[in-house]
Structures are given as C-alpha cells and as structure tokens.
C-alpha cells in the first residue's frame, strides 16, 4: 500500500518559526540579564573592596620603640644646621611629611604652631622634608609657617623608617617620632589621613613622656 504524504500547513510552519524566534529572543534576553547581574555584582564587590581597603589603609598606626634615636645633622630652610645632639635633655617631636606640594602637610605644621601647648610642655617640633629650600619655602610662606624645616636627602627619613608610609614609596608619609631628653624613641605614629588635631597630638605625645 502506498504511504500517504502529509502536506505541511504554511500557517503551522510560520507559527513554529515565530515560536522558535521568540524562544531564541527570550534566551538572549535571559543571557543579557545574567551578564548584567554578573557585571553589577562584580562592580559592587570591587567597590566594596576598595572602600574596605581605603578605610583600612587610612587607619593611624602607632608604636613605642624604646631604642636609641638615630643621630643626624641637617641644614634648615633658615640656613642653619640642626643636630639631634642640640636637644639633649629636651623632648623632641620629629614631623616627617611629604613636603612641597602637600597642602595638608603644611597645614598640619601651621596648626601645631598655633597650639601653645607644645612650647609650654617644652617640646620642640622639628619638621623634616625631602626637599630643597627653594622647593618647600613657597609652601611655608603660603600657609604662614615660621618654623624652619629640616632638609633631608632621604638618609634621615630612611633611618627612622618613615619612607613609603604615605602615597609615595620614595617619600615619608605623615608621621611623628617622639624622642625624649635621653635620646630614646618613645613613640612613633603614622597618619595616612594626612591630619591629626594638634591638641590630640599634644595629648598623645605627653602621655608617652
């Protein structure tokens, strides 16, 4: 017996084609939504990581050393020479900072100058930068800072372990080193936020003497 051939209905064929196209389009849309979700989730994770890292890296750190402070002799912006031995018997607070171009660093020193508590406590603050006089003096004049800055070629900053503590590997960060009258390091603090209220700084320093 001969097999009867089924004729394809054009309407059915068109409906099948439309259903296939619709299914294909839905699959593409679902894939796009999935990719979008993955991208958004990735961005959220990256941003959250950056925020956590930023908060973590901006935390102040401090330590009590207790060792003999490295000796040094440096030229100043005033054209004089300063040595650690000049302050034997007196507490000294070294202020290492990024120097020229760092407005927050210069503002910090301006704030310290305005606080009479340091002088009243007999504490001498020596700001140290890796600049020449020509580089740093305009900043000091701009912020009205009168204290002479000590000009370091990096030797002293390295000796005190302050290099790379800020945004630049080859420069000091924003840190302080307290040396007592016997030449002993009593405290070291680093502040990546580039600012420490002078009143809090004074209180912290006095608590370590």
Q: Where would I find each of the regions flagged by the language model?
A:
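Juxtamembrane low-complexity tails/linkers enriched in Ser/Thr-Pro and polybasic
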Residues: 18-30
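Thiol-/selenol-based redox modules, centered on thioredoxin-like
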Residues: 171-209
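N-terminal "domain-start" segment that seeds a small globular fold
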Residues: 32, 37, 53-84
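N-terminal intrinsically disordered, acidic low-complexity segments at the extreme N-terminus
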Residues: 1-19
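Structural micro-motif
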Residues: 145-147, 163-177
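Short active-site neighborhood of thiol/selenol oxidoreductases, capturing the structured segment around
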Residues: 82-106, 111
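Structural microenvironment flanking redox-active thiols in thiol-disulfide oxidoreductases
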Residues: 106-145, 154-158
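Hydrophobic membrane-insertion alpha-helices, especially the h-region
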Residues: 38-53
């Amino acid at each position: 017996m001969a097999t009867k051939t089924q004729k394809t209905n054009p309407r059915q064929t068109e409906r099948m084609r439309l259903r296939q196209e619709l299914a294909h389009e839905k699959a593409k849309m679902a894939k796009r939504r999935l990719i979008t979700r993955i991208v958004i989730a990735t961005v959220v994770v990256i941003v959250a990581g950056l925020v956590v890292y930023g908060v973590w890296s901006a935390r102040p750190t401090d330590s009590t050393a207790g060792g003999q402070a490295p000796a040094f002799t440096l030229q100043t912006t005033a054209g004089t020479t300063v040595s650690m031995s000049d302050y034997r018997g007196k507490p000294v607070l070294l202020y290492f900072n990024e120097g020229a171009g760092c407005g927050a660093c210069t503002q910090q020193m301006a704030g310290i100058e305005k606080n009479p508590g340091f002088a009243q406590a007999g504490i001498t603050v020596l700001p140290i930068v890796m600049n020449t006089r020509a580089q740093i003096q305009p900043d000091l004049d701009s912020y009205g800072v009168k204290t002479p800055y000590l000009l370091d070629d990096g030797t002293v900053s390295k000796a005190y372990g302050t290099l790379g503590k800020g945004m630049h590997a080859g420069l000091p960060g924003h840190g302080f080193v307290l040396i007592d009258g016997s030449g002993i390091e009593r405290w070291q603090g680093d502040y990546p936020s580039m600012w420490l209220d002078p009143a809090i700084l004074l209180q912290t320093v006095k608590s370590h003497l």
